[in-house]
C-alpha cells in the first residue's frame, strides 16, 4: 500500500472520533432535559375574567385584576385605560362604561 492511501484509510477510520457531533448532541439533550424539568415544576395557570359596568365615564376592576378591554355607551369608541385597572370613556356625554377585567389564577 502506498503511504498516502494508508494515511487516508487511518484518517477515515478516525473521523467519527474527531468530529464533535456527540458533544453537540449531549449538550442539546442536557438543555432539553433542563427545559423539561423546569416545565414540569410549573403549576398550570388559568385566566379568570369578569365584566364590570357602571354609570358614568369610569369602570374600575376589582383588586388584583387588570383591564383587558373597554366599552362605552352612546356608541362612543374613544376610551383609555388608567392605572391598568380603570376604563375611562372619553366622549363628552356618557351614560355607562364597561371594563373587561382579568387575572391569572
Curated annotation (Swiss-Prot):
The keyword Membrane does not apply. It is found in: Secreted. It holds the Pfam family Resistin. One of its GO terms (molecular function) is hormone activity. Induction: Up-regulated in colon in response to a high-fat diet. Also up-regulated in obese mice mutant for the leptin receptor LEPR (db/db genotype). Its main location: secreted. Coiled coil: none annotated. Residues 1-23 form the signal peptide. GO terms for cellular component: extracellular region. This is Resistin-like beta.
Amino acid at each position: 500500500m502506498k503511504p498516502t492511501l494508508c494515511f487516508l484509510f487511518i484518517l477515515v477510520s478516525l473521523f467519527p472520533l474527531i468530529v464533535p457531533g456527540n458533544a453537540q448532541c449531549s449538550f442539546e439533550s442536557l438543555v432539553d432535559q433542563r427545559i423539561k424539568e423546569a416545565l414540569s415544576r410549573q403549576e398550570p395557570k388559568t385566566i379568570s375574567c369578569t365584566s364590570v359596568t357602571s354609570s358614568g365615564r369610569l369602570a374600575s376592576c376589582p383588586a388584583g385584576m387588570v383591564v383587558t378591554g373597554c366599552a362605552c355607551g352612546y356608541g362612543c369608541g374613544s376610551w383609555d385605560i388608567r392605572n391598568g385597572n380603570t376604563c375611562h370613556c372619553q366622549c363628552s356625554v356618557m351614560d355607562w362604561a364597561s371594563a373587561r377585567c382579568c387575572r391569572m389564577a
